[in-house]
Each structure stands twice: as structure tokens, then as C-alpha cells.
Amino acid sequence: MSHFELQPGQLQLSELRDWFYQHQTLKLSDEAKDNIATSAKTVADVLEQGRVVYGINTGFGLLANTRIPPERLTDLQRRIVLSHAAGTGDLMEDSVVRLMLLLKINSLSRGFSGVRQVLVDALIKLLNAEVYPCIPEKGSVGASGDLAPLAHMVLPLVGEGTVRHNGKVLNAEEGLKIAGIEPFELAPKEGLALLNGTQASTALALAGLFRIERNFHAAIVVGATSVEAAMGSRAPFDERVHAVRGQPGQIKAAEMLRHVLTDSSEIAKDHENCEKVQDPYSLRCQPQVMGAVLDQIEHASGILVREANGVTDNPLVFSEEQDIISGGNFHAEPVAMAADILAIAASEIGALSERRSALLIDSHLSKLPAFLVNDGGVNSGFMLAQVTAAALASENKTLAHPASVDSLPTSANQEDHVSMATFAARRLTDIAKNVSDIIAIEWLEAAQGLDFRRPLKGAAAVETAFNCLREQVAYYAEDRFFAPDIKAASDLIQNGELAAVVKLPHILSEV
């Protein structure tokens, strides 16, 4: 098991990726502990001075002008957790909840939230024990933070709700016992500090990003395999073509394709003097499309890393000046727009792959047997698999519609503009899974095409990917139950096995 010392506000993209894919044990740096102690003392001092501060000794939202007496301040914090835990829908995956806990701990450790060390320690104990609060996916509009999901995250600390441990759902009491925690009484400001923030939408967006990274990698490798299967030209990937345009993502994507399509290909040598002048766009324009996708992935990843390290609480505690200021950092518009960018980019990965799958089954374009099967007519081959790819690509076009352009006033018009970031981020998983299946179908077709080109071999990396697939899915000699083949190929993409056997240069620049 890996051990991780948190330096507040310094999480890297690679570290966030590691946390998403695997459990680690977390401890705080000395800087984080100092930050927390200083901030908590400021809140205590403000209360001692009798100052009126939103969320500490007032109501919330439209009830902000209601003064809460000292004897009810802890009750206030508990009640906000209970009342705001109003989510619905399926539960978030453990990997997403793990990221949420990490991001909340990171934010509190910056020292602008006014919570006590004992509270942060309790969150760390949940995380380290892999006791994950059960959090419904739906119920947040992405301002004032992800209130409902974060309330569900906090419920177990106050002895309510349920948790999941080793795949089993337990009540809060059982979960706290495993983590070594007693039910918690929240101090002034702590309930609000836990609920305010963009950690749910950011965690969901990061989860989508990491899945889309694997889709991007697979689309490059499988797209190159389709070039081999269709006996396409390598000339469009020439370094000079992309240098004169100057788009960085395009230059990188072309380099990746050249990396896969090396000079080792017998197929390429066999048709290098053929009469065909140009390939269809889905083969020829891969660097242009995938490069644009890569630029957007890198742009969105930068926004999400900054958000993961940011403080999105309200109000914020500035200890040096003894100020507590109400602002709007909880508004998740940056996350919503980043998620929208990723949705469009991922949808385009699938759209291009679907067009290549259509090309491969068309004997007039690919010069392969119709629907990639012998004895056509008796056998339907890949006919309906390609229809599935078309259905998924079309579904993604709807899912990719921007969520951030929508807003609906809430909380009696106090919160009159919201980001819809949580939905924007949540649908990325659906899009990414669709894209994995689309690429899987293309991969099955391209591998079948390579089999028809035998005894000629493709480039070394193409053959490595081919062998990876053939270990799970046999050559399609005649019609058989097709769905398990698609799932097997998609699993190789989603679980990272394809990425492990075929490495590519600079998939993502670290930010």
C-alpha cells in the first residue's frame, strides 16, 4: 500500500490519477497542521469577540439574517448536514468518493476554513480505512457548492447515513467503528465548511478525465490499426504537414500515430506503390481531430487541477487580518465549463472511431470482405456491431450538449445563477463508457481486417495490440454471440491493459 503525505494545495495531476485508480494511506504535512490550527483559532477568537459572521452564528442562504444564539451553534451545524443530505439516484463509485474525501481534506488543509484538526483527522481516518460514505449522484446544481453530495459525505461523521466498506453497505455506526471514530459533534463553522465546496463536481470531472485519457490512448492505437487494416497511407502523418500548421495537439497526435505506425509494417510495404491517392477523412485527418481533442483535454485538466487545489469554502477565514469574508468560490462554473469541454472532446473521439468502423465493413472503401466475414449472406459479420457503434456515437452527441449554459434559480432566488457542474461532470462517465465501446467495436473490426491481410504483418505496436485483443477475443470465423466480444475489448481499454502494452509519447502534459 502506498503512503502519501499531503502538502496543502500542491496536488499534481498524476497524483490525483493515482488516487482515483488505487487506495493509498494519507497523512498531513506539518504545514497543513499549522494552517488548520491557525484558522480554527481565528474562528474561536471571532466568537469570543461576539462578532456576527455568516454561517458561524447566523442561518444559511436566505436565512442569513437570522442570528443564532450561542447555545444553539453546534446544533446549527448538525442540522445543516441533516437537512442538506437530500440527494437521489445511484450511489457514486468508491473511486469518486475517495477523490472527494481527498479534495475536501486538501481544501481544509489550506487553512482558510476554520475547522479543527480533529475534524480533518476524522476524514483522514475514513479515507485510510476505505470506509466510503454512500453518496447519491444527483441533487447538486453546482452552487452554493455541491451541498447535497457533500452533506451525504459528512453524514456518517455525525452518526447518520450509510457507508460502503469492501463493497458492503453498512450503517454509520458500523463504519465509524471500522475507521476508529466516535460520532462527531461539529463545532461552529464546521458543518458549513464541509458542505460548501466543489469537491463532488471536481471529483466526478476528474473521474471522467481519467477515463477519457484511456479512450484517447486507445483511439490512437486502434485508429492506427485501422490504417493498417484498410491499407491506408502514412503520408498524412508526416511531421512536416503538422509543423506548418503549428497546432500543438495536432503535432503531438501525429507523432503518436507515427510512433505506432513504424517502418516495420509489411502491410505498408506491400501497398506503398498503389494507385490510391487519398484516404477518407476518418483515416487521413486523425491528427487534426485527435490533436484538437488533446488540446481541449489538456486545457480542461489544467482547470480541474487548479480547482482540486483551490479553496471553495464560504465564508473564508483570513487569519493574518482576522477577517472572515463571504464570497462565491463555491460557484462551480470553472468545473462545469471544463466538463463541457471534455464532453465535446470525448464525443469527437467516438464520432471519428465510429466512422472508421463504418469504413472497415464497407468492402468498396476497405477492399476487405463485406462486413468483415467470409460466406457473407449466411453470415452477417460485423453488420450490427457497427450499428451499435452508430447508436452510441449518436447518444453521445446528445450527452455532449453543454450543461453550463443552463441555470435555474434556487433557494428562493438567493442563489439565482448556478453552474450545473455536477451533472456536467457526472455524464462524462456515461460518455466515456460509450466511447470505450465504440473504440472496442472498431478494434474488433480492425483486428479482423488484419487477419484478412495475413500473412502480411502490421507495424510492431499494431501487432502488440492485436495480440492483446486476440488473447481475449478469437478470430470471427462465423456468426456468434457478439456482445461478449465487445465487452471484452472494451474492458481492455477501460482497465488500462491496452495502455500498458502499447506506450505512447506525451498523452498528457502534467499540469
UniProtKB/Swiss-Prot annotation:
- UniProt main location, coarse: cytoplasm
Residue location of crosslink 5-imidazolinone (Ala-Gly): 143-145
Query: Where are residues bearing 2,3-didehydroalanine (Ser) located in the sequence?
Result: 144
Keyword Cytoplasm among UniProt keywords: yes
Write the Enzyme Commission number(s) for this entry: 4.3.1.3
Post-translational modification as stated in the protein's UniProt record: Contains an active site 4-methylidene-imidazol-5-one (MIO), which is formed autocatalytically by cyclization and dehydration of residues Ala-Ser-Gly.
Q: Which reaction does it catalyse?
A: L-histidine = trans-urocanate + NH4(+)
The record's listing under InterPro entries reads:
Aromatic_Lyase (IPR001106), Fumarase/histidase_N (IPR024083), HutH (IPR005921), L-Aspartase-like (IPR008948), Phe/His_NH3-lyase_AS (IPR022313)
Q: What class of enzyme is it?
A: lyase
For this entry, list what GO says about its biological process.
L-histidine catabolic process to glutamate and formamide; L-histidine catabolic process to glutamate and formate
Xref: HAMAP family = His_ammonia_lyase
What this protein is called in its record is: Histidine ammonia-lyase
UniProt source species: Idiomarina loihiensis (strain ATCC BAA-735 / DSM 15497 / L2-TR)
Q: What is the lineage of its organism?
A: Bacteria, Pseudomonadati, Pseudomonadota, Gammaproteobacteria, Alteromonadales
